[in-house]
UniProtKB/Swiss-Prot annotation:
Compartment annotation: Endosome membrane; Microsome membrane
Organism, scientific name: Homo sapiens (Human)
Protein name, entry field: Protein VAC14 homolog
Chief location category: membrane
InterPro entries hit by this protein: ARM-like, ARM-type_fold, Vac14, VAC14_Fig4p-bd
């Protein structure tokens, strides 16, 4: 520093002492400055006061020499003390050089800067609030200072500033929030602790409504909640807990919509505490805001659904996620199916599938359902508990369906999540069928694929969804449209039957009984599509047919009309080109028909053949059952067409008898001994009126080798009374009771011809296969 420079009104002694390395001498100089400034205040000499402050600032506090900077700091503090209540007029000039010293490399100098600013603030009190942001900014840096003395000094200043803010009603929160939002993302644990402590203080001040600005800082708070320091996490939990209490207390002033996506992001984090806290907030938001949260459903589901598959290690998160899921589901009502028509202009705002899927961890979605719906977020700022339930919110399904489809397609996802997805789909088809049927073609393949799931419960829920699709009036169209995917389109063309056959199927009205739901649903155009593709899946995945086929078909018979299911499958199988599969499928359907309790009513309907509908069903089943000779006979036994059964067995002599064929005859004999055929066994007592039944059974006996089944049937026939009555002369003339006299519409001769035609086709295919094999064998020998 130039000793000859003029520092007036500061005397040379003061200047010399301010530059001294000893603190005591600098302190003496400060007292002299205080005395000098007091005189200027008494004289109201503002020019000289400003000159003193400027000199101390420019020539000392901002000097290159460290001792000069220390002298400048203590001198500025002395000026503030001397100015007293008038210091508010000069605060900018007093504070700025001191704050500059906060960045000094010398820790002692940073400490003196804290001390000087403490004295300045202590004198000015509330007058410093217009400069709060710069003070806060400086303090936030010192909070992370490595020097313990500096940190201690900054804490004293921090407490003083908090006291001033608490006792004042002039705090400018609007100007402060941008700075808070910026500083809240600091990764330093001391800076985080400093930020949290200030939020707690501001939250406790009655005149400061921090809740209005919660969307600005909520994301930062959740990030601080993941801090490694236990104390900081605890402090942050307290802050978030206080905010949540305020939200519950005053939901009308909460900007739910602006915070929804923030919660969605943190509900997907890997940190258990953050995830649980965010999920608890989401639960409260859904319950308090109601339908306001609907536009964010796809994001919420993206976050919530995976949590439903958590194990007991994350039981708390799982339980809260389940409440969120159930609460959100309840918000969807039948009125949501009508909103597009009531307000057609809003259709344009529906998010596209690309926009609708919420972004994953680390990025927030732009708006409701992940799309930028500014009209929604800007249009709602204040909600009341009552009004939110009736808020005119449009439910857009694109994003929701995409999320559900994505989770159902993910084979790694947990069972409970898949069940929840299927429950959602079922709920949406019940509440908003017209909207959902726009998405059915995209959902259909994955729903069919889910039938191969390992869990019975998943398959049950999947079948409920498929049954609802197949029976909902909203799915009734003139043309169900092309199926999704090339292989499904191929299956459609491969298994499709002519339209008249379909029309006849869909109009079939069977007896409503145990096989039907309480109110048998009307089948729509998707029903036939479902049957076609289900059979196609059984054809391509034989293990599914073997392991789950009976279970799937029995459940469908409970959910839908059993008669329609059997009628349609028989109709489709009649045109199946893979004859081996057709035979296998017919055998499976026949076993289900004869053994399942769910089909008791349908069996009774077929047993009597009293109505035209039952006769038509018999003829339809018969034509497909012809793919398997033994099942055809069992169908005749079920319907008490014993003469035709005998005629069929006579034709067995012309068939190729294989091991599989004999095994099926063996199973039929076992079935005859079951309760299902009790009526048939009792009819053996009436030999006179049932000669063809006995002949048919003897025919089966003659087909069997000497086996356990042969012995079983032989013993049964030995119990028939008066066997000589089998040779009755008038048996060909009389119409036995077993051959329905009241079924003139059934042309049994034509049915027998059809049986021969189908079996010849099977024989031809087998010969073609064996011919190719023989040809290959000959080539090998040569």
């Amino acid at each position: 520093m130039n000793p000859e420079k003029d520092f007036a009104p500061l005397t040379p002694n003061i200047v010399r002492a301010l530059n001294d390395k000893l603190y005591e001498k600098r302190k003496v100089a400060a007292l002299e400055i205080e005395k000098l400034v007091r005189e200027f205040v008494a004289q109201n000499n503002t020019v000289q006061i400003k000159h003193v402050i400027q000199t101390l600032s420019q020539e000392f506090a901002l000097s290159q020499h460290p001792h000069s900077r220390k002298g400048g700091l203590i001198g500025l503090a002395a000026c503030s003390i001397a100015l007293g209540k008038d210091s508010g007029l000069y605060l900018k000039e007093l504070i700025e050089p001191v704050l500059t010293c906060f960045n000094d490399a010398d820790s002692r100098l940073r400490y003196y800067a804290c001390e000087a600013l403490y004295n300045i603030v202590k004198v000015a009190r509330g007058a410093v609030l217009p400069h709060f942001n710069v003070l806060f900014d400086g303090l936030s840096k010192l909070a992370a200072d490595p020097d313990p003395n500096v940190k201690s000094g900054s804490e004293l200043l921090d407490r003083l500033l908090k006291d001033i803010v608490t006792e004042s009603n002039k705090f400018d929160l609007v100007s402060f929030i941008p700075l808070l939002r910026e500083r809240i993302y600091s990764n330093n644990q001391y800076a985080r602790q400093f930020i949290i402590s200030w939020i707690l203080v501001l939250e406790s001040v009655p005149d400061i409504n921090l809740l209005d600005y919660l969307p600005e800082i909520l994301d930062g708070l959740f990030q601080i909640l993941g801090d490694n320091g236990k104390e900081i996490r605890k402090m942050c939990e307290v802050v978030l807990g206080e905010f949540l209490k305020e939200i519950k207390k005053n939901p009308s002033s909460v900007k739910f919509a602006e915070m929804a996506n923030i919660l969605v992001i943190h509900c997907q984090t890997t940190d258990d505490l953050i995830q649980l806290t965010a999920m608890c907030w989401m639960r409260e938001f859904i319950q308090l805001a109601g339908r306001v949260m609907l536009p964010y459903s796809s994001g919420i589901l993206t976050a919530v659904l995976p949590c439903l598959a958590y194990d007991d290690r994350k039981k708390s998160i799982k339980e809260v996620a389940n409440v969120c899921n159930q609460s959100l589901m309840k918000l969807v009502t039948p009125e949501d199916d009508e909103l597009d028509e009531l307000r057609p202009g809003q259709r344009q705002a529906e998010p596209t599938p690309d926009d609708a899927l919420p972004k994953q961890e680390g990025t927030a979605s732009g708006g409701p359902d992940g799309s930028c719906d500014s009209s929604f977020s800007s249009g709602i700022s204040v909600f009341t508990a009552a009004s939110t339930e009736r808020a005119p919110v449009t439910l857009h399904l694109d994003g929701i369906v995409q999320v559900l489809n994505c989770h159902l397609s993910d084979t790694a996802i947990g069972m409970m999540t898949r069940i929840a997805v299927l429950k959602w789909l079922y709920h949406l088809y019940i509440k908003t069928p017209r909207k959902m049927f726009r998405h059915t073609d995209s959902l259909f393949p994955i729903l069919l694929q889910t039938l191969s799931d390992e869990s019975d419960e998943v398959i049950l829920k999947d079948l409920e969804v498929l049954a609802e699709i197949a029976s909902s009036p909203a799915g009734q169209t003139d043309d169900p449209g092309p199926l999704d995917g090339p292989d499904l389109q191929a299956s459609h063309s491969e298994l499709q039957v002519p339209t008249p056959g379909r029309a006849g199927l869909l109009n079939t009205s069977g007896t409503k009984g145990l096989e039907c739901s309480p109110s048998t649903p009307t089948m729509n155009s998707y029903f036939y599509k479902f049957m076609i593709n289900l059979l196609k899946r059984f054809s391509s995945e034989r293990k599914l047919l073997e392991v789950r086929g009976p279970f799937i078909i029995r459940q469908l018979c409970l959910l839908l009309n059993a008669e329609n299911i059997f009628h349609s499958m028989a109709d489709i199988l009649l045109r199946e080109e893979d004859l081996k599969f057709a035979s296998t499928m017919v055998h499976a359907l026949n076993t289900i028909l004869l053994t399942s309790t769910e089909l008791f009513q349908l069996r009774n309907q077929l047993k009597d053949l009293k109505t035209l509908e039952s006769q038509n069903l018999f003829c339809c089943l018969y034509r497909s059952w012809c793919h398997n000779p033994v099942t055809t006979v069992s169908l005749c036994f079920l319907t008490q067409n014993y003469r035709h059964a005998y005629d069929l067995i006579q034709k067995f002599g012309d068939l190729e008898v294989t091991v599989d064929f004999l095994a099926e005859v063996d199973k039929l004999v076992q079935l005859i001994e079951c309760p299902i055929f009790t009526y048939l066994r009792l009819q053996l007592l009436d030999v006179k009126n049932n000669p063809y039944l006995i002949k048919a059974l003897y025919g089966l006996l003659m087909l069997l080798p000497q086996s356990s089944a042969f012995q079983l049937l032989s013993h049964r026939l030995q119990c028939v009374p008066n066997p000589e009555l089998l040779q009755t002369e008038d048996s060909l003339k009389a119409a036995p009771k077993s051959q329905k006299a009241d079924s003139p519409s059934i042309d049994y001769a034509e049915l027998l011809q059809h049986f021969e035609k189908v079996q010849n086709k099977h024989l031809e295919v087998r010969h073609q296969r064996s011919g190719r094999g023989d040809h290959l064998d000959r080539r090998v020998v040569l």
